[in-house]
């Protein structure tokens, strides 16, 4: 994925450049200041991407296989897994093609490589935007299920969920296409950062409200029978805790990426910012790690999904 015209790793491979910096690697700091740069080997990118790819394929397969998981919430989870799958797949594809070009094992014209780079950029950006949107959709779905429990099934219906999913994918593709077309405009980068922050604020507000309700629930039923207390407390706390974990992981894994975009706008030539830019390999690795962690959370915290995953694995053998 690119943010500046010189940051075209695939095209750079045609010129047999020795640099091993993938994707968004910026120019080296020209001031001579010492910078901490974390080197991420291409093999690690491929390994992380492969693990994420397998995990997310299993999640999507399990949800598609089990009709009990065809609820709106699991539809959003399935789409989030699909977004993670696209993130991993696009990074694996770019890394693999780059290695082949650098080794001379793949011959391609510059125009073909540029088109491939554009496609990979659109896929990566689309999956990023859709991940944000689906995390927000999951948060809203859980919020409605807790605060409007009696009306939940009339508010969040499967047809509405499908329309929301379709709208998210269409909007993500259109916005990512515009982003790639106008990547050199600061306003485009700022829009992405603002969107990221807005979604984080929205989800954080919902999570805090849900946690507050869960705490009130626990206090109100503390004097009741233990089984009743666990039944009431488990529904609110488990859902809120799951979403809070998801938000925290997403922020830690994606935060550096959006910090990178912000600094490109605010201080593209500053020595300190240049040092941060040189660690974009690490930021990409964190994004792929997020795609690895998400399926683990779903599999271990959902008994129905975990059971279906076991059936899928047993059938594959």
From Swiss-Prot:
GO terms for cellular component: plasma membrane. Residues 64-72, 141-163, 212-240, 301-317 are cytoplasmic. The chain crosses the membrane at residues 38-63, 73-93, 119-140, 164-183, 192-211, 241-266, 280-300. Keywords: Cell membrane, G-protein coupled receptor, Glycoprotein, Lipoprotein, Membrane, Palmitate, Receptor, Transducer, Transmembrane, Transmembrane helix. Residues 1-37, 94-118, 184-191, 267-279 are extracellular. Its main location: membrane. Belongs to the G-protein coupled receptor 1 family. Receptor for MSH (alpha, beta and gamma) and ACTH. The activity of this receptor is mediated by G proteins which activate adenylate cyclase. Mediates melanogenesis, the production of eumelanin (black/brown) and phaeomelanin (red/yellow), via regulation of cAMP signaling in melanocytes. This is Melanocyte-stimulating hormone receptor. It comes from Macaca nigra (Celebes black macaque). The lineage of its organism: Eukaryota, Metazoa, Chordata, Craniata, Vertebrata.
